[in-house]
Design a protein with these regions (language model features):
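Nucleic-acid endo/exonuclease domains
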Residues: 9-176
Length: 176
């Protein structure tokens, strides 16, 4: 008898959990809620940018933010070292694009989203080419990498700084 009551309680809680999930998913597809959520997404001073900038500042690196002088207005630019850093969100810049594309094809308004993200990806590629032509080192970080592995991101930036300094020293030595 006790086993039966315990099982019923467990099944009731499980059913309640799934009902809440279904209601939440259904409610989150409401166009007004989607529109409200999209308005909260910023293109400048995002949480991932702020986190990386704070870490760079703490290490003593000075930078320009959203530097409009350069193509693509990189999120962070270390002008002294000619390093352009982009903090990319996984969705809008198409991380794991083939998988994301399949998910988008099943969702609402797939043509719009696929076209938008493909355009973002090609624009990112063109921007990178322009910056490389200008002699900049270009670094892209995914948002989750910044959130979860900020120290590793800093280490990658410091390695790029070291590479820049080393190549500049080599050029100076050859001129002497």
């Amino acid at each position: 008898m006790v086993w039966c009551i315990g099982t019923c309680i467990f099944l009731f809680k499980l059913l309640k959990y799934f009902i809440q999930k279904v209601v939440k998913i259904t409610m989150s597809r409401d166009p007004e809620i989607i529109s409200k959520n999209m308005r909260k997404i910023h293109s400048k001073d995002t949480s991932i940018e702020l986190q990386l900038r704070k870490a760079l500042w703490h290490k003593g690196y000075r930078y320009r933010k959203n530097y409009k002088v350069l193509p693509g207005s990189p999120d962070i630019v270390l002008t002294k070292y000619k390093i352009a850093i982009f903090c990319d969100s996984e969705f809008f810049h198409g991380k794991d694009w083939e998988i994301l594309k399949l998910r988008l094809e099943k969702g609402k308004n797939p043509d719009y989203w696929i076209k938008k993200i493909e355009h973002n990806r090609s624009r990112d590629f063109e921007t990178d080419k322009k910056l490389l032509f200008l002699g900049y080192t270009v670094i892209h970080f995914w948002g989750q990498d910044i959130k979860k592995h900020t120290d590793e991101c800093l280490q990658a930036i410091e390695e790029a700084i070291w590479d820049t300094n080393f190549s500049n020293d080599t050029i100076k030595l050859s001129d002497e």
